Amino acid sequence: MNSILKNSVMAFALMFTSLGAFAGVQVGVSSDNYFRGHNISDGVGYHVFASHNLDNGLWGGVKLMSMDGDADHFMASMIGYDYNLSDKIEIGVGYADYSFQGGDGDGWNEMMMSVSYDGLGSLRYRKGLDDAGDMWSFSTGLLKYVDLSYGDWDDGGSYFQISKSWDMMGGSVKVGYIDHEDNDDDFADKLTDFDNFFVGYSYNF
């Protein structure tokens, strides 16, 4: 079953690549690359993200992030389907394949489910396949001036992030603070530790 889903993801990505149908390509650089609360670049990192949304609700995308450690890059390939229940409510399902490029790390696969309410936020649940852990997360811009997100991953612990984005030079600048449960520093030390803060710039083509 997993091999069928993997092949579907790759076929979807190859189809769009061959047709030149990617509607959006984003490139970015950040003081640190974070994935689910974990700093995977241990310093300046970059990412490339290509995606496409079809008119019938189907979508697909591939994201590549630089990393430091046992691999050169971390890649996420995803396909999914979104459906609007109303003007405010959207539900979605999808499949994701995560892999490590240039190293020996083992990847994993997930089924994804989400519900979003316009003006309130999004709740996402990811079911790990085989022996992979599950994850749920919530994100919201309800605080008006900043975005807030929280996630809890069986294989990686819990984290929260607060961030703010601005349009600049044709792209977007994002600054934020992220804290993971593995960080044992007291609150005062966390606020003075620059490792907990990040700044990045991304540009969409």
Name the predicted role of every residue range.
Residues 2-12, 18-205:
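Outer-membrane beta-barrel proteins
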